[in-house]
Amino acid sequence: MKILGIDPGSRITGYGIVTKEGNRLIHVDNGAIFTDSAKDFPSRLKRIYGSLSEIIETYRPDAVAVENIFFSNNVQSALKLGQARGAAIVAGVNAGLDVFEYTALQVKQAVVGNGKAAKQQVQQMIKVLLNLPEIAQEDASDALAVAICHAHSVTIKRLTSASVQEIKSKRYK
């Protein structure tokens, strides 16, 4: 399964692509989409959408995982972040992909095993899990973490579903 993780932002949107083969996680690519703050906001959203659409077309992921907004003290920033998330989600949906959302707490829990882990701990664990030569750019690293979170979530859902089916089959025999 190939997963595109996205860390949306109105100035910088990180992306990370991870393949899960059995129990192995394999790094495919990562990077950041930078928008020009001198341009109007709709043009910046168009850049995010267009760049992610190109990435989806190039790498053909099976699923998209996006970091969810937790909170923001600045209403204007939260609205812009929400719109950037919307552009990312639409890029995935428009390509016919399922889009999954995870909170920062869920991502940290999946990657480090501690929902309150420091950013440096998460970055270091990503480097180890994906056998990267160095820590990825901050936004790209966050996106890789979201992709890893989804990879782990799919495994857990599969195991849970199999266990439920096994219990049901025994109960009705």
Curated annotation (Swiss-Prot):
<feature type="active site">
    <location>
        <position position="7"/>
    </location>
</feature>
<protein>
    <recommendedName>
        <fullName>Crossover junction endodeoxyribonuclease RuvC</fullName>
        <ecNumber>3.1.21.10</ecNumber>
    </recommendedName>
</protein>
<dbReference type="GO" id="GO:0005737">
    <property type="term" value="C:cytoplasm"/>
</dbReference>
<comment type="function">
    <text>The RuvA-RuvB-RuvC complex processes Holliday junction (HJ) DNA during genetic recombination and DNA repair. Endonuclease that resolves HJ intermediates. Cleaves cruciform DNA by making single-stranded nicks across the HJ at symmetrical positions within the homologous arms, yielding a 5'-phosphate and a 3'-hydroxyl group; requires a central core of homology in the junction. The consensus cleavage sequence is 5'-(A/T)TT(C/G)-3'. Cleavage occurs on the 3'-side of the TT dinucleotide at the point of strand exchange.</text>
</comment>
<dbReference type="GO" id="GO:0008821">
    <property type="term" value="F:crossover junction DNA endonuclease activity"/>
</dbReference>
<dbReference type="InterPro" id="IPR002176">
    <property type="entry name" value="X-over_junc_endoDNase_RuvC"/>
</dbReference>
<keyword id="KW-0233">DNA recombination</keyword>
<keyword id="KW-0234">DNA repair</keyword>
<keyword id="KW-0460">Magnesium</keyword>
<keyword id="KW-0227">DNA damage</keyword>
<feature type="active site">
    <location>
        <position position="67"/>
    </location>
</feature>
<feature type="binding site">
    <location>
        <position position="7"/>
    </location>
    <ligand>
        <name>Mg(2+) 1</name>
    </ligand>
</feature>
<dbReference type="Pfam" id="PF02075">
    <property type="entry name" value="RuvC"/>
</dbReference>
<feature type="binding site">
    <location>
        <position position="139"/>
    </location>
    <ligand>
        <name>Mg(2+) 1</name>
    </ligand>
</feature>
<dbReference type="InterPro" id="IPR036397">
    <property type="entry name" value="RNaseH_sf"/>
</dbReference>
<dbReference type="GO" id="GO:0006310">
    <property type="term" value="P:DNA recombination"/>
</dbReference>
<dbReference type="InterPro" id="IPR020563">
    <property type="entry name" value="X-over_junc_endoDNase_Mg_BS"/>
</dbReference>
<keyword id="KW-0479">Metal-binding</keyword>
<keyword id="KW-0238">DNA-binding</keyword>
<dbReference type="GO" id="GO:0003677">
    <property type="term" value="F:DNA binding"/>
</dbReference>
<feature type="binding site">
    <location>
        <position position="67"/>
    </location>
    <ligand>
        <name>Mg(2+) 2</name>
    </ligand>
</feature>
<dbReference type="GO" id="GO:0000287">
    <property type="term" value="F:magnesium ion binding"/>
</dbReference>
<keyword id="KW-0378">Hydrolase</keyword>
<dbReference type="GO" id="GO:0006281">
    <property type="term" value="P:DNA repair"/>
</dbReference>
<keyword id="KW-0255">Endonuclease</keyword>
<dbReference type="InterPro" id="IPR012337">
    <property type="entry name" value="RNaseH-like_sf"/>
</dbReference>
<comment type="similarity">
    <text>Belongs to the RuvC family.</text>
</comment>
<keyword id="KW-0540">Nuclease</keyword>
<keyword id="KW-0963">Cytoplasm</keyword>
<comment type="subunit">
    <text>Homodimer which binds Holliday junction (HJ) DNA. The HJ becomes 2-fold symmetrical on binding to RuvC with unstacked arms; it has a different conformation from HJ DNA in complex with RuvA. In the full resolvosome a probable DNA-RuvA(4)-RuvB(12)-RuvC(2) complex forms which resolves the HJ.</text>
</comment>
<feature type="active site">
    <location>
        <position position="139"/>
    </location>
</feature>
<dbReference type="GO" id="GO:0048476">
    <property type="term" value="C:Holliday junction resolvase complex"/>
</dbReference>
